[in-house]
């Protein structure tokens, strides 16, 4: 027997989780399905932006700006920093902490607004007079029946022909946000927000 909802949102990125929360705030019984998970299997809500895009890139940018300020601009204020160095592992750990705080914040907002979350991959089964049936493949196999379905499945990086991502020499945004050392040379193709 399928659980019944007014709205089911497939995708927990910025478009999906905001749509789910707003639908619930407007009084609709709402569910959200997303398959992104952390290394320990917990929900990684927030999509590309939160997990491997805007948020982590800005967290690393802030760390690098602080390093730059300490090395060049603090002196103008009479602050001398001796033995300044970069700890990439700590920068990456901080980035991961920022991501987790954002993931946990979305889970909290779902609970606060009574959005029922299902971890897994949603797919359409059939549409009938009662609504659309969506099957969830994930930790549990469940079916949901919804009057309305919002598809907010986000985006994926696109490799150039003949230059597939190997995350060693040719990096996607995911690989670029986990580089363990500062590269001596780096070329960037693309001009997206990440």
Where do the PLM segments sit?
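Glycine-rich flavin
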Residues: 2-5, 21-28, 32-182
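Mid-domain beta-loop-alpha active-site segment that forms a flexible
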Residues: 106, 193-194
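Beta1/beta-strand and adjacent pyrophosphate-binding region of the FAD-binding site
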Residues: 2-15, 182-192
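N-terminal glycine-/charge-rich "phosphate-binding" loop or analogous flexible N-terminal tail
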Residues: 13-19, 23
